Regions:
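Amphipathic alpha-helical protein-interaction segments enriched in hydrophobic
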Residues: 270, 334-337, 436, 480-485, ...
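Elongated alpha-helical scaffolds that mediate protein-protein interactions in large eukaryotic proteins
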Residues: 2-205, 212-221, 230-246, 261-264, ...
Length: 651
């Protein structure tokens, strides 16, 4: 490398050829393929000039030929260049700058298949090491180049293989691109099954170092990075019980209490939601518990944080519908969805804490609890208003219309819909995370809080609930679980039942119930069948609430299809999971309740189903008795005994 000339001298030797593109191309090939570093350097300098002039942008074939002519080892040597007895500081800087500039341009111009090859991805480690002594302009180019490389899985794996990421970590508080590189690397690599463990190890190694690096700053960039990265990780790649969780939450708490900017509020909201989703067992207590070491006169942190989230939601709703077609709506929707997710988690944590006397580290005075209850109720009422307006703008056109009464639709590539000008042109309502999170928080609140007015308001969304339930099998988001949870709270009131039946809700959930029976008994796969069975249990609870309500005199004729469907159930010889067993028992309970409450004539028409139902009870008893959980086994056996007695009385 001692014989290498500075970049300027190499460029001068090739300038004469620039006027002849063919001669230039051949000269560059010759120089780049030479065995000596001096010629290679001259060729590289000439190549940079040609690339900067844009002469090869529209010639992918020649671009690829020149890329293949480059020696990867030579590029690595240039990237490693540093000042010594033989190389001046200026020359070493020129060498690094030249290699970085050429790699940066090629990373942009090369087609995807070439960017996946080792010839480019193998430069990741030398590029990271070159960050140590690079000036700001070169550092920025290096980071942009690495970011392009790791946007594909092959490049992401190269970052995972680097043992020392300290050059990247140490500049992360000055260059957000460094955090973007880590995010792309982890999320892309996590999609490869064989790399999940490596991703976990890398995260556990890097995040503690990042926490130290951002110490003494407001850490907004870092907190935002973790909040955006965690939800994109494959669930299996998220580290289990990480040691960095507690110090990370301490950073989040510090940001919340420091009167942050709008960017800071977005960052802590999304991080809190991401951590609660990834670590539902450990994070709620770490985030919401009272810090006894603080000022005893100060309000609990959980009160402060939840109150700030509620204020953000309430202040955002009035102008949100007008922003549906604006560029800022997706970001606002994401932030408010995260806020609702945090509030949902807090409500669950609050209920558990009040029920469990052993939870001693959560304390909130009665007056603060009452104020929080009032604020949450007010926010949920505004939430209902927004959901109503958003749905009407998107689908219904007017509150509560039965689907058959909707008119004025226009054909689009996605079916027919009302041509209302305020509906989002690109964000369908059934793909809006804010709608899902808003319904989820509302469902939890009306179930836990005895607020009849709010339940009646929620019942006014019944047309939206039923339609979204049907659309869940087609869209990217699954609304069925929060909707079923909301229905449990709504079915306490007669207005809720009338609205549900008026929108054909029974038929919609019954169709889902039949599909769940097929998936759990005919072609069961343990994981999916258990998830489906859990949803089936929720459906049964909703339907039982309707049947048992004082407003329901007798079951309708069409409801009795549940009985014939249950008699066709197949109990598998191999013991299913406990939740599937519980679901099958619940189906028997639903059927016997329908038969018990039916009128005389209807009972006679379906009395032939009783022997088949009794046979199912007998089939399930040995399976239940052999369950691993003895407590659950005894409870289900008692239910089966009750069902056997009810069916015997129906004969």
């Amino acid at each position: 490398m001692a014989e290498s000339s500075p970049q300027s001298k190499g460029a001068e030797r090739g300038m004469d050829a620039l006027n002849d593109p063919v001669a230039t191309f051949e000269k560059m090939q010759e120089l780049l393929k030479a065995k000596d570093d001096t010629s290679r350097f001259v060729g590289l300098a000439l190549l940079k000039t040609v690339l900067d002039n844009g002469q090869l942008i529209n010639d992918p074939q020649r671009l690829r030929i020149l890329w293949d002519a480059l020696s990867p080892k030579f590029l690595d040597r240039l990237l490693r260049a540093h000042q010594n007895e033989k190389v001046s500081r200026t020359d070493s800087k020129d060498m690094v700058d030249l290699a970085v500039a050429v790699l940066h341009t090629f990373s942009i111009l090369l087609p995807e298949e070439a960017r996946r090859e080792k010839r480019l991805t193998g430069r990741t480690a030398p590029l990271v090491k070159a960050l140590i002594q690079s000036p700001p302009d070169t550092t920025k180019l290096i980071l942009q180049t690495i970011l392009t490389i790791v946007s594909l899985s092959e490049g992401a794996l190269e970052v995972l293989a680097i043992q020392d990421l300290s050059p990247l970590i140490e500049i992360s508080n000055q260059y957000p691109l460094a955090l973007d590189i880590l995010s792309f690397s982890w999320t892309n690599a996590s999609a490869i099954n064989t790399e999940v463990e490596a991703v976990r190890n890398s995260i556990n190694q890097v995040i503690p170092a990042l926490i130290i690096n951002f110490k003494g700053t407001d850490a907004v960039t870092f907190i935002g990075f973790i909040g955006n990265m965690l939800p994109k990780l494959e669930p299996e790649a998220a580290p289990r019980n990480p040691k960095w969780l507690e110090p990370l939450i301490m950073m989040l708490r510090k940001l919340v209490t420091s009167k942050p900017t709008a960017a800071g509020r977005t960052a802590y909201t999304q991080l809190a939601a991401a951590l609660l989703q990834s670590y539902p067992a450990t994070c709620p207590s770490l985030l919401f518990q009272h810090d006894a070491s603080g000022n005893s006169d100060s309000k609990p942190f959980s009160y402060l944080m939840v109150n700030l989230l509620l204020i953000d939601i309430r202040s955002s709703f009035p102008s949100l519908l007008a922003k549906l077609n604006s560029e800022e709506y997706p970001a606002i929707s994401q932030r408010l969805a995260a806020a609702f997710d945090v509030i949902s988690s807090f409500i669950g944590f609050l209920v558990r804490s009040l029920d469990d006397e052993s939870v001693s580290r959560f304390s909130m005075t009665p007056d603060l609890l009452l104020k929080l209850r009032k604020d949450i109720a007010e926010t949920m009422s505004l939430n209902i208003e927004y959901l109503r307006d958003r749905w009407d703008a998107s689908i219904a056109g007017a509150s509560g219309l039965h689907p058959s009464a909707r008119t004025g639709t226009a054909a689009t590539s996605e079916g027919t819909r009302l041509t209302l000008t305020w509906e989002s042109m690109k964000d369908n309502v059934n793909a809006d995370a804010l709608i899902l999170a808003g319904i989820g928080a509302l469902a939890i609140w009306i179930r836990e809080d005895e607020n009849e007015n709010l339940r009646n308001e929620t019942a006014g969304l019944m047309d939206m609930f039923v339609d979204l339930y049907k659309l869940s099998s087609q869209g990217t988001l699954d609304f069925r679980y929060p909707i079923l949870l909301a229905l449990e709270g709504i079915m306490i009131n007669e207005e809720g039942i009338d609205g549900f039946l008026g929108q054909d809700g029974w038929l919609v959930v019954f169709e889902d119930l039949k599909s769940i029976l097929r998936s759990t008994t005919e072609q069961p796969t343990i994981s999916q069948s258990s998830i489906d069975a859990g949803r089936g249990l929720q459906i049964v609870r909703v339907l039982l609430a309707i049947i048992d309500h004082e407003a329901t005199s007798f079951p309708r004729e069409d409801w009795m299809a549940v009985v014939t469907t249950t008699t066709s159930m197949k109990v598998t010889a191999t013991p299913p999971s406990s939740v599937i067993i519980e679901f099958l028992v619940a189906m028997l309970q639903l059927s016997s309740t329908l038969l018990s409450k039916s009128s005389g004539g209807m009972t006679k028409r379906y009395v032939t189903s009783v022997p088949a139902l009794s046979g199912l009870v007998k089939q399930l008893k040995p399976i239940v008795s052999n369950m691993d959980d003895e407590v659950e086994s005894r409870e289900l056996m008692a239910l089966l005994d009750d069902e056997a007695l009810v069916l015997e009385n129906l004969r």
